[in-house]
Amino acid sequence: MSNLDVIEKNARENHVPVMLEDGMEFLVQYIREHEEIVNILEIGTAVGLSSMKMAEIRETIHIDTLEVNEEMYKQAVNNIKENHLENQITVHLCDGALYHTDKIYDLIFVDAAKSQYKNYVEHFYDNTKTGSKFVFDNLNFHGIVDNPDLTHNRSTKQLVGKIKKFREWIQNEPRFKTVFYREIGDGIAISEKL
């Protein structure tokens, strides 16, 4: 078992919010097939698993990854160092909505506060170019977005409503061409900047 496999196993056993396995495989394969993807911004580091898997695709890939939780941040930094990927991955301890940079990214992977997805698009829009992609995870939210009766929790219903509203917005947003992959992971969308 590789070191990344151990990190992934521990994360899943401890309910750390990491991407579902088939969703991660899909994202890695997508980046592998698109060699123009070199500069990546990840919003939501957790323990650094997805960053490390993306960095392993090509040595030319550089990732800025943002994590708001200090414990997760420390664990991610440690995991990245242990896997000798600190030259490719820079972890920033901050809220994604407060991060500012002049960098232009080929891909922005959004896997953070679901209710803030639209704000992240607007906040980082100028950090992209024509052809850059936004990748969004958790757009099904465990199947509840399409079947809201699966929960009776009021705050979950509100969150699901925001995710549904975001899905409709990004699908119809004329600045992007969006493709949904509802059957992969917990629902993924890729929005390409036009």
Report the location of each language-model feature:
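A short alpha-helical cap/connector motif
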Residues: M1-L107, K114-K133, L139-L194
